[in-house]
Curated annotation (Swiss-Prot):
Residues 93-123, 138-206 are annotated as: Disordered. PROSITE patterns: G_TR_2, IF2. Residues 311-318 are annotated as: G1. GTP binds at residues 311-318, 357-361, 411-414. This is Translation initiation factor IF-2. Residues 138-155, 168-188 have a biased composition (Basic and acidic residues). Its main location: cytoplasm. GO terms for cellular component: cytoplasm; cytosol. Residues 357-360 are annotated as: G3.
Amino acid sequence: MADMSVKQLADLVRTTPERLLEQLKEAGVAITHVDQTISDEEKRKLLLHLKTSHSTETDKKRSKIVLKRKKLSVVKSGKKSVNVEIRSKRTYTKPVVEQKRETEPAPTQEVPPTSDTTNLNEKAEVNVATLEKAVEAEVKEEAKKTPSEKKETPKKGPRKETRRSRKPDKEDKWEREELHMTKLVEERRRRHKPAHMPDSDSASAKLEQGFARPTAPVVREVALPESITVADLAQKMSVKAAEVIKAMMKLGAMVTINQRIDQETAAIVVEEMGHKPKLIKEDVLEENLVATLGEQTGEAVPRAPVVTIMGHVDHGKTSLLDYIRRTKVTSTEAGGITQHIGAYHVETELGMITFLDTPGHEAFTAMRARGAKCTDIVVLVVAADDGVMPQTVEAIQHARAAKVPVVVAVNKIDKPEADPERIKTELSTHDVLPEEWGGDTMFQPISAKTGEGIDALLERILLQAEVLELKAVDNGPARGMVVESRLDRGRGPVATVLVTSGELHLGDILLVGREYGRVRAMIGDDGRPCESAGPSMPVEVLGLSGTSVAGEEAIVVPDERKAREIARFRQGKYREVRLAKKQTAHLERIFDRMGEGKQNTLNIVLKADVQGSLEALTEALNKLSTDEVKVNIIASGVGGITESDVNLAIASDAVVIGFNVRADAPTRVLVEREGVDLRYYSIIYDLIDEVKKALSGLLAPEFEEKIVGLAEVRDVFRSSKIGAIAGCMVVEGVVRRHLPIRVLRDNVVIYEGQLESLRRYKEDVAEVRQGTECGIGVKNYNDVKVGDQIEVYEKTQVHRTIA
């Protein structure tokens, strides 16, 4: 604290400089003038003097009151009696209040230089006043008590005396806090208090709770995991679960208190109820692992480019790869079309290139997207005689989404009807411009049959790779992507992994999505086992715990325990999210099904050879569902058809479909014995067409009405047996017996029924043709009048198909 003058200090403590000089003199501080400065040491000396003088004056003003009490009582136990005498002594200090002098014009308020002295004075005054009140109340209580009231049982006497002896301590504790009460409230409370409770209202007032009901709604920030139950969501918002259920009913969703909802639905509910959602991810363990493995030490070296061949079906993608590899891969594909991704590492005269061959069928959209995700260059194959097709446009969109350069290969130029210039024009409408037109896309005419232009295509691919400057670290823990996975009967789960960085060795712990395992064997694209694989190398890995999802990232983990922990965590999270989405979809359709009739369902057990084909088939079959019929895939998997699949089909009345897989001998015996519908397919076209036919058979029959003839009523006769007989003239078509009819009056249908009798000249006939008179009897209808028209029609069933 900086030094200040006596005058400044007097202004600060709000007293006169003369009074402050007197106090300084009494404290022994040698200051005689108001303009002299006072140091911190002199201030502390003054404060100590004021505290000492104040306590001395207070002690002089106090006097002591000693209260003695003696109680006699008798305790009887049977014939004996014991006299009990209880003595108590209590001492109180009573302050003497001095009268203020009238001679002083105005009282001066002495304020010590620090806040410590002020608090000490206030606490001393409160303590003295409280003790004075306690003494007065105790004296009044002693005067009011009668001898009969003083007699107490010996058991209660000491207990009450002990309580009363503790009261001054309690009051002292309460007096440590300041009391904020108006005088009116204090007087009103004192009037209703009994006399034996001395000044307890001040103590109870200090113990009052300070809670006040909020006037404005409380807005909370609610942390939402990827799935949460309705009860937990209500607890996070501090509301009842019934309110959350009510809010979701307003949004059109029926939920229960223990039902799980996904993160997006929970965020909408939180916003609807006036709070702020905060989306959190429960994958901290995964992020930490990726962060630790993300720092790969080592120098980046050039690597081979990963080239994905895309295009429409039957445009020659696999044939182009055949010519480059000098093999016949197309002959191994059913129907000559690619139905899964093939990864091949090709060593050409110009350099190393890794090729990915993707399917062109529309059902394999997800597989093409995966191919574009892990590639460096996309070779777009377009047939010169066919032009740009839907899957060609889709491949362009995948390449743009992945921000990958495109090299266009115009195939089949050896055909007479080939027109490469038309291909350039059609691709230019999709913003794919050749270099000679001022664009940045390289075009190369080729023929996968004769080999024309293929060397030039490889040169363009490697030129594009040099421009991209592709590099990767070739040592350390490996990272890659699962291109395809399948379940081999003899070797177990097999995953085709494309290494992107690092080096994969035998014995490494590999973590792939929800699966993990030790690499027991690695097989190259040429079918030979290998010890290690570097960047841009595709290998088949054996040893995983299950068939992994294609497109997942593969990471080498140093610890098997950590890999197992992360895999189980991912499995639990995937199960919760899938269950939440399934329940949400089920509840969204509940109201739609209430007003509709029974929906016919075709249950299917689907088995495929690889994971990618299974995904494509599942998506394609689910798209066939309509409002009337539905495809329900109750089970799907990778690998051969087993007895458990057949038993599941028996229990659910399902059709077993195998795509490029077969059933073993015991399973075939079970199929024949139980009569299960088992079908094998190797081409996706045939599978989808057969399922369409099966769904068409489940459609409700549709009937079409065809007007056969029209007769005009000329006269009406009455018959005792039949009733009214209409004499008619057939004016159009043929009138046949036992066909449904309509009676029209003024071109308005007034009755629909059955033609009961048809006569001509009193003879029953089967039909009457145009221009012939006849008598017609309508079943259960006698109100036929002249001028009416009788329309005869028949219903024919129309064959319905799935579009």
